[in-house]
Amino acid sequence: MGEEEKKPEAAEEKKMEEKKPEEKKEGEDKKVDAEKKGEDSDKKPQEGESNKDSKEDSAPAAPEAPAPPPPPQEVVLKVYMHCEGCARKVRRCLKGFEGVEDVMTDCKTGKVVVKGEKADPLKVLARVQRKTHRQVQLLSPIPPPPPPPEKKAEEDKPIVEEKKVEPPVVVTVVLKVHMHCEACATEIKKRIMRMKGVESAESDLKSSQVTVKGVFEPQKLVEYVYKRTGKHAAIMKIDPPPPPPPEEAAAAAEGEKKEEEKGEGESKGEEGKDDKAKTDEEKKEGDGGKGEGEAADNGGGEEEGKVVEVRKIENPYYYYYYQPPRVAIPPMEMPPHAYPPQLFSDENPNACTVM
């Protein structure tokens, strides 16, 4: 019995020993919290005292007066004004302009003073220059210099390959122009020399030809001559001849190649075609005789049956009469007036003599 009573007592002692270190830790934590609260409470009265001192120092200071507004910006321009009317015109064009509050002009010195905080000097300058049509200078404020150009933009631009420009070809053109006198030849030569690109022009009155030398298109020269002189011109000769365009030159080269290939193929196939050609000729001769006979039979009849009407006589009589005037009612045909009968005429020796 004694041992059983000792066992629960030993278990209780162990529990008490385990609780003691936990209680010690809790006590230490409480002490640390209390110390922190004490420090905070000490700081608060110090801050309050400092705030009170600052309020006491600021209280006796007098309130500061508000700063005066800055004067409005002045724009000074130089404009030529020879009378009060010019000055009035300048003031009127700037009155009510954006940002302008007041305008003062001085005709003697030629200065215009524009007051306004939001007035843009460059816009005011452009306004006066546009309205007065005079040269205007901006004396103040001096506009800032333009920013330097960005080098990056130049670097970013793609490099363009320079195309080789071929030198212009000097062309000599002979034109056929009708000229009936020396004045015509001189006038045509003078007009042609005014065309751009023409170096020289020579006119020949006997052959009615004009020789033109220079850098130009022959077709445009013909159009220019007709436009300036009213005379039709024809191109007789071009020296040197103009080169064909690239598309036509390529097509011509391809055509030459095809012709060469065809020539080689034809030379190979000529031997085989000789026999066929002979047989074809014999057949054609046989068919040709029949065709000629049929053509003779049919063609002869057609030629005989054709009647060519040279002139058709509308009026069967051999005399004429005046046409009636045009009226709304269709005209009536008048009976034709015949010649008097010659049967009983005294002038006709072959007339009847039995009277």
Swiss-Prot record:
Keyword tRNA processing carried by entry: no
Record GO terms (molecular function): transition metal ion binding
Post-translational modification: Efficiently farnesylated in vitro.
Residues annotated as binding a metal cation 2: 181, 184
Domain HMA per the UniProt entry, residue ranges: 72-136, 170-234
SUPFAM superfamilies linked: HMA, heavy metal-associated domain (SSF55008)
Pfam families with a match to the protein in the record: HMA
Binding site for a metal cation 1: 83, 86
InterPro entries (UniProt xref): HIPP4/7/8/17/18/19, HMA_dom, HMA_dom_sf
Lipidation (S-farnesyl cysteine): 352
Keywords associated with the record: Lipoprotein, Metal-binding, Methylation, Prenylation, Repeat
Region Disordered: start-end pairs: 1-74, 132-157, 235-308
Residues modified as Cysteine methyl ester: 352
Keyword Lyase: no
Bias type Basic and acidic residues, positions: 1-58, 254-293
Propeptide residue interval(s): 353-355
Record's compositionally biased regions (Pro residues): 63-73
Annotated function: Heavy-metal-binding protein. Binds zinc, copper and nickel in a reversible manner.
Family that this chain belongs to: Belongs to the HIPP family.
Protein name: Heavy metal-associated isoprenylated plant protein 7
Organism: Arabidopsis thaliana
